[in-house]
């Protein structure tokens, strides 16, 4: 593995007597796609919420770029270089694709913004939005209201909004949800490209996509880690086959 930029040790989150995430330890390196897979209710989204600071852990630790980040809130986690997308598309539908990305870029400005100064006056913000759209291949769609874009393009816009905040670590929660084969292939190609300059932690149910793009996998069941390893190790793991992959294949 290259330089480890995101690492958890024994990360745990209780809701009352339920351990939604229980003792999860994993590491993600720069230039790596680390996929977290598992059946519904395994704790995958709760794990991402812990990593993004949207939820505080009940126990365990988290490091970002070698420094302790345990229990930090989402704003501080974001400023440390972490961006996330959500399971459900989280965009401003009436606004254009460019305006969505510009809003995201504004959220990372360290200088104060004058209330009566138009957003268009901030060149660095507009440039960040344009770069983000170009990174996801939608530079020609910037002037279109997001409501008029396809579902796949809306998911790309959400990733572009994440990129507009200039993260080094991407937490992506089911970016291929609800997509057809052509749209999925486009997102997989995008993830491959982004992995060259980012660490990506990916939660996804599309196993074809996962095995096409992941460098490492963690399998979760009932909040705990069942197995971790390279794709070929996970694919041949009998416990994983019985608990998850076998059920996935039977359902197809």
Walk through the language-model features, giving the residues of each.
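Glycine-rich phosphate-binding loops of nucleotide-dependent enzymes
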Residues: 2-252
């Amino acid at each position: 593995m290259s330089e480890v930029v995101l690492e958890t040790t024994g990360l745990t989150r209780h809701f009352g007597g339920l351990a939604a995430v229980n003792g999860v330890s994993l590491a993600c390196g720069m230039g790596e796609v680390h996929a977290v897979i598992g059946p519904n209710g395994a704790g995958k989204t709760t794990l991402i919420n812990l990593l993004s600071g949207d939820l505080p852990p009940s126990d365990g630790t988290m490091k970002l770029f070698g420094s302790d980040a345990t229990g930090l809130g989402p704003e501080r986690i974001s400023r440390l270089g972490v961006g996330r997308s959500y399971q459900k598309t989280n965009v401003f539908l009436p606004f254009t694709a460019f305006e969505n990305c510009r809003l995201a870029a504004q959220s990372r400005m360290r200088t104060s913004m004058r209330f009566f100064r138009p957003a268009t006056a901030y060149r660095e913000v507009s440039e960040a939005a344009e770069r983000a759209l170009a990174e996801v291949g939608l530079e020609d769609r910037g002037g279109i209201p997001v409501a008029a874009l396809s579902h796949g393009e809306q998911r790309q816009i959400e990733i572009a909004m994440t990129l507009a905040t200039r993260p080094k670590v991407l937490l992506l929660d089911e970016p291929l949800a609800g997509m057809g084969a052509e749209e999925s292939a486009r997102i997989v190609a995008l993830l491959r490209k982004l992995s060259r300059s980012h660490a990506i932690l990916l939660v996804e149910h599309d196993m074809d996509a996962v095995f096409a793009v992941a460098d490492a996998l963690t399998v979760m069941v009932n909040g705990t880690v069942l197995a971790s390893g390279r794709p070929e190790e996970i694919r041949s793991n009998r416990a994983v086959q019985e608990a998850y992959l076998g059920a996935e294949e039977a359902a197809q």
